[in-house]
A protein has these predicted regions:
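Residue-level marker for beta-strand->alpha-helix junctions and adjacent short loops that shape enzyme
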Residues: 36, 51, 84, 111, ...
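Short Asp/Glu-rich motifs
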Residues: 88, 96, 115-117, 140-141, ...
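Hydrophobic faces of well-ordered beta-strands that scaffold small-molecule active sites
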Residues: 29-31, 77-79, 104-106, 129-131, ...
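Radical SAM enzyme [4Fe-4S]-AdoMet core and its adjacent flexible, acidic
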Residues: 1, 123-124, 134, 142-259
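Conserved alpha-helical substructure of the radical SAM core
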Residues: 2-128
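Hydrophobic alpha-helical segments
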Residues: 62, 78, 91-94, 127, ...
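Glycine-centered loop/turn positions within well-structured domains
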Residues: 39, 138, 167
């Protein structure tokens, strides 16, 4: 993970980053609570679908697992899927993690967040809700293989902001959406979304069959340069934003490029 905004702020402060006692940082755990999902996205690394899958953990086992993670020093838990909002005990699970003292985030496609449950989402006190947006309307709907999913995701972001929930936009970079990245970042500001997470294609599940969609190296370099530019703008203008990338440690090479 490359924390672009964090890195640029540390440069602006002109102070060394303090070392943590003990040397190693506590791990961040992304827990796919279930594989069931209401979408069949082209890039899905877990090949999720709207059906039951055998062998998944019972809620009691999940709660016990959270206790084990906390005992092992895990402080950050991201609840994902599948679509985590399809888990019948999601809010109980989130509450248990919060009671254990964890930072608890939700990673969702956003289509199941609506006026009927936004209050419950707010009451769960997620520290962060990440909602996927993989291009503008036509591109996103084609990528997610469901018409209307773009509008539903945007509506979810607006509802989260109105409920004072910290929300982020999550985008998987592909050849199909790379040219739309500037527009997505403009949309981020328009919606007052505080975080942007750029993911690279994971070659697993349906993502393995969609490798031809992966962004070429030039596209990736251009995207990273743009994220550095937008992050720097926001810092200079005092905006509360956070730009992060994931699924490719080579992104850190851009740090050198940004200062040549």
């Amino acid at each position: 993970m490359l924390r672009i905004s964090h890195y640029l702020r540390s440069l602006a402060e002109d102070a060394p980053t303090p070392r943590r006692a003990g040397g190693r940082r506590a791990p961040v755990v992304i827990w796919n609570l279930l594989r069931r999902c209401n979408l069949t996205c082209k890039h899905c690394y877990s090949t999720s679908a709207d059906s039951d899958f055998r062998g998944e953990l019972e809620t009691a086992e999940i709660l016990h697992g959270i206790d084990d993670l906390r005992a092992a020093g895990v402080r950050v838990l991201i609840l994902s899927g599948g679509e985590p909002l399809m888990h019948p005990d999601l809010f109980e699970i989130a509450a248990h993690a919060r009671q254990a003292g964890m930072f608890v985030a939700l990673s969702s496609n956003g289509t199941l967040i609506d006026e009927g449950n936004i209050q419950r989402v707010a009451e769960a006190r997620f520290d962060y809700v990440g909602i996927s947006l993989d291009g503008l309307r036509e591109t996103h709907d084609r990528f997610r293989q469901k018409q209307g999913s773009f509008d539903a995701a945007l509506a979810a972001m607006r509802l989260c902001r109105e409920a004072d929930i910290r929300v982020g936009m999550r985008t998987t970079l592909t050849e199909e959406n790379a040219a739309q990245l500037p527009a997505l970042l403009d949309l981020m500001r328009e919606l007052d979304v505080q975080k942007f997470y750029l993911s690279h294609l994971n070659y697993s599940g349906r993502g393995r069959r969609s490798r031809a969609l992966d962004a070429h190296h030039r596209r990736t370099r251009e995207a990273l340069a743009l994220l550095f530019e937008r992050a720097d703008e926001d810092i200079r203008q005092g905006r509360d934003s956070d730009f992060v990338t994931g699924n490719n440690d080579a992104d850190a090479i851009q740090i050198g490029r940004a200062h040549v």
